[in-house]
């Protein structure tokens, strides 16, 4: 029985449909590393690779070689952007080739013959002038040097000429002003170029209106440095640089819509040079800036997504930007526009505050969460609740299109990152479904109706062979096609760039074996996948289409957009090949609120209402001085809605918002008025926080002004613009417990939360990795870091702890070496460990680790030991000390405190972590049993220690000691130096200037010990690292011009005294700044003792402490900015709403009111380098609803006109001068004359450049007494000499022999040692060694080393003696005897011709005789002089004894002085004051009077009574 024919036809069609597959061909002849470039609206493909240029006109089935590569230069290809269907250029073999007919024919472009092209950089095409091309190449000039050259062609690339802009430059970037056919610039061939030099302030912006024949310079504004430009259809955007010395400098944007007039755009936050990734234009002429705010060049999140950590969107005139982030916590986000779907954006919140993905389909006005659904229950990964099923997309910035709302993306559900899948959306990204269970590369065809995907892992389906999957119904169903090769896919593209075609090329690298991990890059696999015969080539009819409305049919910028797309189930080809995706547009009749934006004077609040933008008004000054009415909203540019809404005007109060208005402020300010150098004004930005601000710290980098702030409520905030804007770190997350910064890696910080998590950032808080800490109680102890490995650190936790007071609770040290991914217990009972090997310069191992270990068996005595390891305790540790009190690492030293039997402390020091030496304390320390000491620092080559000599009833003071260079022996610098209960000492080194130290001493120590008085403090200062001390010289007048009232004008009764380190609320608030060289600010008083804080005034010095000025009555807080170019003060401990500031190094002061209401300013902070123009005020206030704190960011950048010019080639015409620290230009400090750099103009700011690097050492000086300090156990006398401490005998140096059994000899100390900082040369030499002495018991070895044996005696003495006797006899025989003998010796005179000279020998002998005669006469005369001096001395002595001494006026000669100096110091060698013995015979030196300091006299080469200056050169 036959089946009906109609049934056979149906069965045939069904079977054909079921068995249909695309035509897949393996292509041959394609280079393994070739680029595949399809022409638009064409079947022609270019393959450009190592072998050359191949062309295929049949979708790659057959290839023809057109150009062969010789391999001399890199190969590149560029398709003509505006004629992509026919024109392309290829750079090959150092030449440029072009085609005008899809690669069928190629021509060589002609260039000037004097240059050899080596690399193509850019080729740019005009959308309107089709025959004009501009190109940039690297070429060799006549000297064979490679440089960048720019060319222009006016004949469609056949020939090029040099683009001569008439400017010298290092590089140049040129573009056509019109970048597309939709450009709003004039439709012509105008060319915009920017020339670049090594200094951005010399860059030029140039415009040509005649195809590059001539250029004119465009003016952006006066004193504006810029380094880049961006083009959109409506705007030319210039990126200007505020600081030309900083690679990560802040930038401003200047915008022009006509390439003539430029206006500065308002930015809501600071931007850096590295922040801007790209600028695109959205509907309504709005610009969108994607930002990558990180020090890393390609920061990625856990999914591999590049982090656009924020976005900025402008209003429709391009001049006012607002943040595009939508997170309630302002978390870091990735924001990506879907460019072929107008108004559609996808946003991913990244990091701790991640809220998943959200989407906007109305140009960013509203946002909604991406919705995932599992229709048909196909996904093996399930969610308990579909509402909690978060879709995480993998690469949201890559969309294959264009399509009519059909999107394909990779991603995963919730946290299942390892289970990547392929997802499909058919409504423009609002709703998503799983397409494939595995990740793959993909492409769309027929405008999204056909989808091709290839698994990234060929074995994802348990089959080692590669395959492709394809869908013919927009991703609803999928079919598999098995391929013949095993390979790793690299890319799949639609050969038709507009997405309309049905042919694809799949490329990859083959795998030799199924288990290969690395593909063979020399064996490329290329497939052609052809879908042109799908559905038998049937074209869709009208019934097969549906309407897809963009934005769900809502109006976007006044219009509705509708796509006509194929139905999902239709069995036909929906589009036409080479026909672009089109949409229908319908103008909206009624305008809606979303068609409007806030007027420039307004900004949307949290409820979406336009309110007055006071920050914008203050920053720009764009309003008159009187109140005005302004519409709060305006229609967005290019909006097409017809019937506008009635917009009400709102009052804008502009009082005090535009202080730069010339009507309000005179151009030359009077005293007390603000300076008006710049075009803007000081800006203040407020932020408030619930609770008290308890932590704040800047990252110590110049990349930006990032900081972390935490409150008493456990909330943490991150700012990258010095507190203008904040990110809430733990929004709706666990409270913050502790914050630690890495002292060695300035971009790293660690945040502990109360749930046992550690959040780590290595990019200044832009991104964080979350680490689960080992199970333990957080004790709030600091982390210990490896100084050379940021991934290695030690964490301390409490084990067996129910609470911190639990008796079973003990500290455990955990170490991680992989950045916290894993932790291991370092050592049982280790309570304090440090990576000393990574910080000690002399250590043999960077991994040397010291640990203080608690002995659990001696809990009552709290015994601690010190152990070391170099293998992280994999082997048995080395016990360094059995008992210690503690240890600390300070610079180049590790100092260990070891307990003695009678509660005294012994300190040991090491510089390499292996050899330890007991510190030798001076004999005159006045401390019977040292019970406490403080290590004060070691930055100048010596260790400073404070040993406590008295501590009772919260009163403490002690001796200040300084070590030699290896930290072992100490001398006492000062007694009774003030200390507090916590061990902090009134000791501070002036930052940036070596050897200047301030300290407070207790002047009534005896009364305090007796209990009869309170502390009386006075401040002393040293300018030579502690050798000489003096009280601070006070100013003559106070800030009111009145004299100070002191009992005496002498310095010992009337000096400046300052409150110091022990009284500070924040120990970071130092007198000085390392960038404001020579400047110090302090609170104190003039008198014979330091008064209470509230009775003091505020003082300033700009010359390192030599002279001071009272700048304010009362106590003020202070901060330095811009290297001292800005000084700001705020009342300390009082409610205030203003600050005082100076821009001329304290000569004049101005007040700035930052608020109407008064607050308590608890601190003023800025970046650690003190180089910024912004300051952060930490404020507090008690209000009705509880305690509230805040910050005020005060920005001075608008106050200055320009950046200071630093030009060493033209120093008389820049903004800097060199100055010296000290009273005299000829003054030497530490053996050299130094000059420092400081700006000389108020109108400019310095920026981030380190001025200290330009410090000039003019020359080294000859050594004087000021270059030496007393040696160990020697004490300085009133006359400046160093004498042995009373009660000691010389020769104690022999003790060194006991410590080193191999030593044979030792040397006695001269009593002096050279200051480590001194670089003096020649002159006085006080630290020379004595003659060697034998070590006890080593006399024999000493004699062998320095003694003379019999044979040596014969050679050294007897042989020369025989020679001398023989020579003497010869001279006597040939000279003296022949000429009459000794009888004529007294008659011989130089120049006489009486001597016998018959030959040359006689002449030589007679010359010797004449020299001997002359020498004898000099010796005889010298004997007479000595006899007269002896007689005169006897007479003077007897005259004094008899009371008949009279003034004597003698002409003291150089030699006479030396002789008398020897007499003066004779017999005092043990007191180390024999200065004459240390002087080089041929050295010149000056001896002059010096000012006597209080208690400590400067050294005098003359007696104190004389005032004469004796110069050895006279």
UniProtKB/Swiss-Prot annotation:
Please list the residue ranges that the record places on the Cytoplasmic side of the membrane: 1373-1514
User: What is the species listed in this Swiss-Prot or TrEMBL entry?
Assistant: Candida glabrata (strain ATCC 2001 / BCRC 20586 / JCM 3761 / NBRC 0622 / NRRL Y-65 / CBS 138)
Task: Give a GO cellular-component term.
Answer: cytosol
Full protein name: Vacuolar protein sorting/targeting protein 10
> In its UniProt record, which GO terms are filed under biological process?
Golgi to endosome transport; Golgi to vacuole transport; protein targeting to vacuole
Basic and acidic residues bias: start-end ranges: 658-674
Keywords of this entry: Glycoprotein, Golgi apparatus, Membrane, Protein transport, Receptor, Repeat, Signal, Transmembrane, Transmembrane helix, Transport
| Locations listed in the record | Golgi apparatus, trans-Golgi network membrane; Prevacuolar compartment membrane
| Family listed | Belongs to the VPS10-related sortilin family.
User: Glycosylation annotated at which residues?
Assistant: 54, 342, 416, 746, 966, 1260
Q: Sorted alphabetically, which CDD domains does this protein's record hold?
A: Sialidase_non-viral
How is the protein disposed in the membrane?
A: Single-pass type I membrane protein
Compositionally biased region (Polar residues): 1505-1514
Q: Which InterPro entries match?
A: Sortilin_C, Sortilin_N, VPS10, VPS10-sortilin, WD40/YVTN_repeat-like_dom_sf
- Any coiled-coil regions, as ranges: none
Q: Which regions span the lipid bilayer?
A: 1352-1372
Signal peptide annotation: 1-19
Q: What is its main location?
A: Golgi
Residue spans of the BNR repeats = 55-64, 151-160, 359-368, 423-433, 469-479, 717-727, 814-824, 1099-1109, 1141-1150
> Which pairs are disulfide-linked?
none
| UniProt cross-references to PANTHER family, sorted A to Z | SORTILIN RELATED, SORTILIN-RELATED RECEPTOR
């Amino acid at each position: 029985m036959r089946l009906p024919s109609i049934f056979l036809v149906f069965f045939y069609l069904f079977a054909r449909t079921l068995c249909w597959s695309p035509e897949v061909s393996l292509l041959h002849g394609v280079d393994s590393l070739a680029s595949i470039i399809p022409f638009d609206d064409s079947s022609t493909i270019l393959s450009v690779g190592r072998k050359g240029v191949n062309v295929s006109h049949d979708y790659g089935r057959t290839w023809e070689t057109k150009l062969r590569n010789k391999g001399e230069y890199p190969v590149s290809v560029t398709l003509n952007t505006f004629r992509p269907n026919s024109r392309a250029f290829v750079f090959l073999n150092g030449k440029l080739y072009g085609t005008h007919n899809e690669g069928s024919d190629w021509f060589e472009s002609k260039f000037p013959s004097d240059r050899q092209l080596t690399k193509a950089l850019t080729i740019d095409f005009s959308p309107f002038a089709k025959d004009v091309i501009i190109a940039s190449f690297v070429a060799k000039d006549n000297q064979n040097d490679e440089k960048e050259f720019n060319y222009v062609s006016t004949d469609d690339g056949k020939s090029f000429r040099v683009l001569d802009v008439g400017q010298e430059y290092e590089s140049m970037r040129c573009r056509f002003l019109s970048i597309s056919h939709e450009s709003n610039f004039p439709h012509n061939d105008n060319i915009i170029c920017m020339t670049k030099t090594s200094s951005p302030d010399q860059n030029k912006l140039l415009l040509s209106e005649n195809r590059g024949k001539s250029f004119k310079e465009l003016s952006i504004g006066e004193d504006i440095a810029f380094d880049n430009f961006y083009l959109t259809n409506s705007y030319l955007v210039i990126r200007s640089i505020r600081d030309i010395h900083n690679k990560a400098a802040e930038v401003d944007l200047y915008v022009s819509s006509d390439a003539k007039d430029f206006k500065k755009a308002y930015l809501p936050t600071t931007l850096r040079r590295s922040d801007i990734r790209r600028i695109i234009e959205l509907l309504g002429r709005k610009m969108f800036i994607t930002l990558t705010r990180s020090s890393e060049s390609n920061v990625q999140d856990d999914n591999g997504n590049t982090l656009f950590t924020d976005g900025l969107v402008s209003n429709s005139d391009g001049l006012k930007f607002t943040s595009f982030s939508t997170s309630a916590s302002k978390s870091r986000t990735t924001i990506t526009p879907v460019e072929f779907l107008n108004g559609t954006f996808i946003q991913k919140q990244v990091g701790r505050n991640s809220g998943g993905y959200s989407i906007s389909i109305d140009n960013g006005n509203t946002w909604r969460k991406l919705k995932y659904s599992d229709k048909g229950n196909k996904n093996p990964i399930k969610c308990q609740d579909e509402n909690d099923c978060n879709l995480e997309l993998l690469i949201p910035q890559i969309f294959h299109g264009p399509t009519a709302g059909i999107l394909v993306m990779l991603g995963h559900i919730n946290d299942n990152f390892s289970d990547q899948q392929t997802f499909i959306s058919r409504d423009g990204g609002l709703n998503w479904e799983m397409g494939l269970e595995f990740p793959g590369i993909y492409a769309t065809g027929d405008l999204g109706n056909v989808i091709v995907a290839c698994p990234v892992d060929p074995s994802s389906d348990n089959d080692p062979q590669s395959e492709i999957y394809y869908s013919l119904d927009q991703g609803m169903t999928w079919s598999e096609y098995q391929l013949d090769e095993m390979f790793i896919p690299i890319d799949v593209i639609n050969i038709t760039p507009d997405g309309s075609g049905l042919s694809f090329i799949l490329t990859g690298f083959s795998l030799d074996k199924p288990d290969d991990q690395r593909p063979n890059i020399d064996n490329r696999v290329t497939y052609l996948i052809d879908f042109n015969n799908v559905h038998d080539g049937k074209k869709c009819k009208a019934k097969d289409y549906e309407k897809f409305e963009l934005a769900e049919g809502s109006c976007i910028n006044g219009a509705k957009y509708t796509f006509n797309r194929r139905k999902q189930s239709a069995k036909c080809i929906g589009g036409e090949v080479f026909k672009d995706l089109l949409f229908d547009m319908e103008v909206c009749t009624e305008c809606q609120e979303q068609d409007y934006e806030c007027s420039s004077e307004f900004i949307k609040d949290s409820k979406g209402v336009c309110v007055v933008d006071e920050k914008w008004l203050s920053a720009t000054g764009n309003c008159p001085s009187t109140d005005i009415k302004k519409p709060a909203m305006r229609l967005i540019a290019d909006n097409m809605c017809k019937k506008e809404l009635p917009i009400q005007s709102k009052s804008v109060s502009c009082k005090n918002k535009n202080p730069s208005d010339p009507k309000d402020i005179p151009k030359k300010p009077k005293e007390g008025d603000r300076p008006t150098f710049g075009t803007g004004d000081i800006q203040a930005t407020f932020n408030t926080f619930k609770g008290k601000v308890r932590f704040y710290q800047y990252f110590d980098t110049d990349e930006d002004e990032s900081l972390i702030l935490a409150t008493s409520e456990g909330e943490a905030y991150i700012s990258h613009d010095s507190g203008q804007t904040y990110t809430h770190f733990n929004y709706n997350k666990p409270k913050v417990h502790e914050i630690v910064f890495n002292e060695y890696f300035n971009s790293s910080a660690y945040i502990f939360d109360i749930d046992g998590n550690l959040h780590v950032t290595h990019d200044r808080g832009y991104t964080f990795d979350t680490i689960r800490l080992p199970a333990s109680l957080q004790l709030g102890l600091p982390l210990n870091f490896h100084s050379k490995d940021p991934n290695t650190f030690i964490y301390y936790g409490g084990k067996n702890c129910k609470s911190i007071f639990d008796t079973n609770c003990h500290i455990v040290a955990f170490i991680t070496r992989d950045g916290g991914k894993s932790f291991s217990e370092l050592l049982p009972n280790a309570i304090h460990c440090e990576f000393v090997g990574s910080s000690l310069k002399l250590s043999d191992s960077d991994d040397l680790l010291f640990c203080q270990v608690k002995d659990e068996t001696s809990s009552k005595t709290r015994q601690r030991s010190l152990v070391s390891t170099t293998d992280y305790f994999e082997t048995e540790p080395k016990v360094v000390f059995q008992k210690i009190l503690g240890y600390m690492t300070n610079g180049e030293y590790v100092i260990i405190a070891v307990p003695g039997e009678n509660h005294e402390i012994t300190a040991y020091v090491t510089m390499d972590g292996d050899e330890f030496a007991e510190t030798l304390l001076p004999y005159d320390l006045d401390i019977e049993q040292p019970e406490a000491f403080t290590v004060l620092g070691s930055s100048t080559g010596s260790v400073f220690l404070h040993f406590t000599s008295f501590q009772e009833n919260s009163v403490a003071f002690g001796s200040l000691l300084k070590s030699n260079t290896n930290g072992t022996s100490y001398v006492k610098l000062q007694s009774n130096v003030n200390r507090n209960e916590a061990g902090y000492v009134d000791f501070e080194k002036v930052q940036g200037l070596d050897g200047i130290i301030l300290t407070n001493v207790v002047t009534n120590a005896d009364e305090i010990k007796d209990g009869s008085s309170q502390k009386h403090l006075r401040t002393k200062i040293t300018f030579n690292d502690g050798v000489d001390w003096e009280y601070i010289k006070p100013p003559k007048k106070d800030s009111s011009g009145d004299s100070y009232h002191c009992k005496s004008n002498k310095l010992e009764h009337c000096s400046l005294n300052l409150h110091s380190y022990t009284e500070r609320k924040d120990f970071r608030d130092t007198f000085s700044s390392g960038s404001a060289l020579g400047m110090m600010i302090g609170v104190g008083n003039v008198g014979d003792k330091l008064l209470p804080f509230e009775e003091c005034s505020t003082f300033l010095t700009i010359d390192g402490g030599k002279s001071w000025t009272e700048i304010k009555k009362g106590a003020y807080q202070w901060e330095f900015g811009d290297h001292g170019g800005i000084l700001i003060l705020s009342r300390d401990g009082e409610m205030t709403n203003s600050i005082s500031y100076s821009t001329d190094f304290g000569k004049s002061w101005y007040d700035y009111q930052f608020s109407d209401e008064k607050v308590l300013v608890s601190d003023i902070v800025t970046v650690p380098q003190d180089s910024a123009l912004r300051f952060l005020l930490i404020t507090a206030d008690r209000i009705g609803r509880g305690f509230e704190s805040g910050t005020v960011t005060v920005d001075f950048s608008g106050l200055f006109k320009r950046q200071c010019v630093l030009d060493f080639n033209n120093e008389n015409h820049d903004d800097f001068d060199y100055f010296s620290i000290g009273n005299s230009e000829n003054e030497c400090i530490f053996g050299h004359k130094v000059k420092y750099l400081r700006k000389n103009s108020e109108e400019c700011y310095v920026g981030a450049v380190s001025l200290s690097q330009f410090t000039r050492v003019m020359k080294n000086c000859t050594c004087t007494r000021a270059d030496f300090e007393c040696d160990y156990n020697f004490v300085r006398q009133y006359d400046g000499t160093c004498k042995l401490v009373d009660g000691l005998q010389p020769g104690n140096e022999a003790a060194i022999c006991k410590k080193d059994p191999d030593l044979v000899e030792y040397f006695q100390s001269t009593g002096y040692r050279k200051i480590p900082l001194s670089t003096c040369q020649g002159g006085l030499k006080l630290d020379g060694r004595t003659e060697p002495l034998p070590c006890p018991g080593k006399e024999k070895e000493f004699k062998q080393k320095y003694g003379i044996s019999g044979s040596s005696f014969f050679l050294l003495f007897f042989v020369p003696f025989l020679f001398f006797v023989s020579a003497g006899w010869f001279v006597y025989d040939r000279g003296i005897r022949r000429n009459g003998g000794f009888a004529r010796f007294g008659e011989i005179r130089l120049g006489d011709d009486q001597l016998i000279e018959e030959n040359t020998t006689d002449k030589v002998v007679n010359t010797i005789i004449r020299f001997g005669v002359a020498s004898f006469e000099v010796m005889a005369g010298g004997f007479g002089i000595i006899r007269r001096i002896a007689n005169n001395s006897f007479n003077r002595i007897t005259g004094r004894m008899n009371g008949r001494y009279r003034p004597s006026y003698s002409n003291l000669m150089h030699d006479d002085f030396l002789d008398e100096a020897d007499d003066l110091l004779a017999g005092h060698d043990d007191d180390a004051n024999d200065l004459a013995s240390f002087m080089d015979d041929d050295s010149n030196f000056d001896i002059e009077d010096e000012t006597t300091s209080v208690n400590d006299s400067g050294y005098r080469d003359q007696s104190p009574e004389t005032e004469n200056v004796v110069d050895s050169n006279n």
